[in-house]
Amino acid sequence: MDIAKIGEFGLIERLTKDFKVKNESTKYGVGDDCAVLSYPDSEVLITTDLLMEGVHFDLTYIDLQHLGYKAAMVNLSDVFAMNGTPRQLTVSLALSKRFSVEDVETLYSGIRLACDKWHVDIVGGDTTSSYTGLTISITCIGEARKEDIVYRNGARDTDLICVSGDLGAAYMGLQLLEREKNVYYSQVEEAKRKGDKRALEELAHFQPDFSGKEYLLQRQLQAEARGDIIQKLREAGIRPTAMMDVSDGLSSELLHICKQSGVGCRIFEKQLPIDYQTAVMAEEMNMNVTTCALNGGEDYELVFTVPIGDHAKIEQLDDVKLIGHITDRKFGHTLVSRDGQEFELKAQGWNFDR
């Protein structure tokens, strides 16, 4: 159905008609000029992410439901990275004419899946038209007690550096998708050049080769915010001294922590958690797997520091790896290779010159 047939308000009503409030802090959600929230005993955390088609996602290989899920999860991840609990979400969309009502419903179904997983209320947003493509802007609102909030600037000399999950898989998943996309388009161009109509018809049923790489696809297409790690830390009585989520790459995030905390760091290549599929894919593509793990981005794992006294507790946690320690600023930022050589840790995350 064409969105113009039901209009903006009709679309909003259709998307939000079944929303049920999950949080006491949500006093009034969708349906008025503003949502009404109440946080009498907590600090309020607010984060926003903007995703643009052609810059942050490619609809050639991500479907709208997965896109909605990922768009929500990257915002929830920011709240977890502050040691908070996400409570509400607003969703704003700019849509070109090629998107139907059903397309938007599919996108929203992914957003709702993410929100249902972490008991988050969708309380508002906006829609508008776009001349080109799709733009998604999501704002997440969370809460935390003042004494529980973890900033980037709290790391101290001798603190341990930890990371959840594994690194580089999402980036290698992207490389896999790009490879298969290029294979498809090169075959299409070849068929067109030869005027081979039969080949073009067969390419309509093109099957990319993802065998043995399913985990990499999942990490790229279905990002997960690590709220489970926050729960484990709380249950273990561990309060990180500094924390970030790994969106631009481990190197970039760790250097942010060091800069804002006024410290140095020392991490060890052999301690970096890397999945087997990531290593195999890096070898296939003649890429350095350590570089992928350090700079790939979109892992949405948590990198955090804890006092050295929490070492025994950290060792007991599943899916958390100790990768190094914080040093005095004068010692710089060091990566120790598997053979003991020392290199300056550098960030290759997102920037405006990229």
Where are the predicted features?
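Extreme N-terminal cap/leader segments of soluble proteins
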Residues: M1-D63, M82, V91
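Short, acidic (Asp/Glu-rich) active-site segment that either coordinates a divalent metal cofactor
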Residues: L45, T135, Y151-Q231
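Glycine-/charge-enriched secondary-structure boundary and capping motifs
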Residues: D2-K20, R98-D121, Y131-I136, I141, ...
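Small-aliphatic-rich amphipathic alpha-helix that forms the alpha element of a beta-alpha
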Residues: L64-Q88, S109-K117, K232, S251-I257
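Glycine-rich anion/phosphate-binding loops
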Residues: Y28, T60-V74, R98-S109, E147
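Glycine-rich anion-binding loops of enzyme active sites
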Residues: S38-D41, R87-E180, H325
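Residue-level signal for inorganic ion chemistry
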Residues: V36, N75, N83, I122, ...
